[in-house]
């Protein structure tokens, strides 16, 4: 072992006894970090609240990421290159799917202009948003990006809660946002039945955003804990509290799939962390819910009646969509391309569908199933990218568990990566920002020379070795990258 390696080991041993504090985004001046945090929040707010707002025919949610990526790429070139390098595997996946989608669309007979527009609006936009979020988050720091995300989505959730309580001002505010985006109110079923959606484009979009808000908060908490205390198997009470808030917000949207995903996450989390107190909380909570069930149901059914029903057309139509989507895939395994609309093909299958309850859903809606939608968009060729996807999930490691509510939710809706969901790229980009664990400088003291047998090499010269150790303990070497950090895909 070399002298430098032995000296570095001495430094690590000495630093273990020192207090640890988080230093997130501290490499940049405060004003730079504050400006980046504001930019991240504005960019996210445009995607959440005004996704269809256009300027000169171009959507604002596309203008902001392009502009901010260009600005921060010029001002912080090194950070931009680092973000590009960190996201290279995910960017390669987006590029591969763009090529596959374009090829499938061409083979299906889609016009070239439509193919180009679809590739730009789906894959290129996803790549730009991902890089913009990653670069800005590297400047602002992970914590600031998380706070901005929770603030933007939290505002929409609060407005949705007021809408659930039938506060007219909350509905008027949403109507104003709809007019700004030229959203036809008479064409939205959600406005007809006054289903709460906050300031998001739809209740489904808000539910998707809530799952991602929970995911980024819980993953960031886990990331910080690992950076300060190392890999831990203990549960985090803050995550459980966040889950309860998440459940309450989902009640406002009257969307069932995120709640189902939340309970599945809770079971998996309790099992992996061996947290008996979570199990006891579930038991006592279930007992309390049983005793308060009549009052609880009366309250919920008066505000969100669909939440407690499993026999409505929305639930029954899921079987229709699953059967219809599977039939479409089996009849054309090569796929239908990026502009595929399943409700354009229902007549061929109507003889098999019309006897099913809520069969008319196939005439009017998309498949409401993320997996089947992807298979029909890209065809069986998408299976070639499964190894890349598995590697990305493996790189994410223990943080994948916090996305369980998101995964469960998109299975039942027209939402997900590359399918009506831009916010996922903000979350992935933000979580790729480094969490740096800095150790306070140890006492400046001279180390006694080690014996040769301790390092398997020549004895260290006393004065030279001590000087080398003190050099390693200088501020230049005062930062250790936590092993448990979120590895960028």
Feature names for model-found ranges:
Residues 51-64, 112-121, 201-208, 234-270, ...:
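Helix-loop-helix junctions and helix-breaking kinks within/between transmembrane helices
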């Amino acid at each position: 072992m070399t002298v430098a390696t032995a000296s570095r080991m001495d430094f690590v041993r000495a630093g273990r006894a020192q207090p640890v504090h988080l230093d997130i985004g501290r490499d940049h001046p405060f004003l730079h970090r504050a400006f980046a945090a504001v930019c991240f929040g504005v960019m996210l707010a445009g995607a959440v609240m005004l996704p269809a707002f256009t300027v000169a025919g171009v959507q604002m949610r596309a203008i902001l990421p392009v502009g901010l990526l260009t600005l921060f790429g010029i001002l912080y070139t090194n950070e931009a290159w680092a973000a590009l390098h960190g996201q290279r595997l995910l960017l390669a996946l987006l590029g591969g799917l763009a090529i596959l989608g374009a090829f499938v669309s061409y083979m299906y007979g889609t016009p070239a202009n439509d193919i180009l527009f679809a590739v730009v609006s789906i894959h290129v936009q996803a790549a730009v948003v991902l890089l913009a979020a990653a670069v800005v988050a590297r400047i602002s720091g992970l914590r600031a990006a998380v706070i901005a995300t929770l603030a933007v989505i939290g505002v929409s959730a609060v407005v949705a809660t007021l809408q659930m309580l039938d506060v007219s001002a909350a509905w008027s505010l949403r109507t104003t946002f709809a007019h700004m985006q030229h959203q036809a109110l008479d064409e939205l079923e959600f406005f007809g039945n006054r289903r709460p959606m906050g300031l998001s484009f739809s209740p489904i979009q808000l539910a998707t955003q809530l799952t991602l808000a929970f995911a980024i908060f819980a993953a960031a908490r886990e990331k910080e804990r690992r950076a300060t205390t190392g890999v831990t198997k203990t549960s985090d009470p803050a995550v459980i509290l966040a889950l309860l808030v998440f459940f309450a917000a989902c009640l406002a949207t009257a969307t069932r799939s995120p709640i189902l995903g939340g309970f599945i996450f809770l079971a998996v989390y309790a099992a992996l962390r061996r947290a008996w107190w979570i199990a006891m909380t579930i038991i006592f909570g279930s007992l309390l819910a049983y005793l308060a069930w009549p009052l609880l149901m009366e309250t919920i059914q008066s505000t969100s009646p669909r939440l407690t029903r499993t026999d409505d057309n929305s639930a029954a139509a899921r079987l229709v969509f699953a059967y219809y989507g599977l039939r479409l895939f089996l009849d054309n395994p090569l796929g239908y391309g990026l502009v595929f609309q399943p409700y354009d093909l229902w007549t061929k299958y109507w003889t098999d569908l019309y006897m099913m309850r809520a069969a008319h859903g196939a005439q009017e809606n998309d498949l409401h199933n993320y997996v089947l939608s992807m298979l029909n968009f890209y065809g069986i060729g998408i299976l070639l990218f499964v190894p890349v996807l598995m590697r990305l999930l493996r790189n994410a490691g223990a943080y994948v568990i916090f996305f369980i509510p998101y995964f469960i939710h998109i299975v039942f809706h027209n939402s997900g990566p590359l399918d009506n969901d831009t916010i996922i790229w903000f979350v992935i980009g933000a979580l790729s920002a480094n969490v740096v664990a800095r150790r306070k400088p140890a006492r400046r003291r001279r180390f006694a020379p080690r014996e040769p047998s301790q390092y398997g090499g020549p004895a260290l010269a006393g004065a030279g070795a001590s000087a080398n150790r003190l050099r390693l303990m200088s501020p230049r070497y005062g930062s250790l990258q936590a092993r448990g950090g979120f590895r960028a895909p």
